[in-house]
Amino acid sequence: MNYKDFLNELDKKLQEYFEFHKEHINCTIGCSSCCENGDYPLSAIELEYLMQGFMILNSKDKITVQNNIKNIVKGGACPFLIDKKCSVYQYRPIICRVHGLAYLCKDNTVKVPYCAKNGKNYAKAYTDGEITINPIKENLDTTVLLKDFDYGEIRNLIDWINH
C-alpha cells in the first residue's frame, strides 16, 4: 500500500471515530485554534506529501505560506493556515487528521485534545484532567499508525523548515 492509499484508509477510519464521538466533537469550519499555536510534529514522509500540496497551491496562497514560513516561531501558528483554513487540507499530516479525538495510548493513558480545556471537544466529558467517557481504543500516535512505512525522522515543522 502506498502512502496516499494509506491516508485514504486512515481517513475512512477516522471519519467513523469522529462519527462515534460526534456528541463530544465541536470542530467546525473556521475553528482553527488547534492550528494557531503548536509545534506540529511530522515525519519525513508526511513532509514530502505536505509539500506536494504546497506545490499545487495558487500563486497567491504560495506567497502567503512562504511569508508565514519566514515569520514562523516555535509554538506559533501553522504556516499553512490561511484565513483560519488549512491551505493544504488534503495533504495535512497525521497529527492534524487525528486531532480532536480522545484515544488510548500504549501506556493506557488517554490522549485528550488540548481544546477540551478550552470548552471545545470532550469539554463536557473532561474534568480535572480526567475523561469520563470511553476513548477510542486505538492508539492514533503517528509512529504507531506509520509502523508499516519507512517514514523517516520525526521533527517539529519549524525544525524541518530551519534545517
Located regions from the model:
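Short loop/turn segments that flank or connect secondary-structure elements
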Residues: 1-33, 37-163
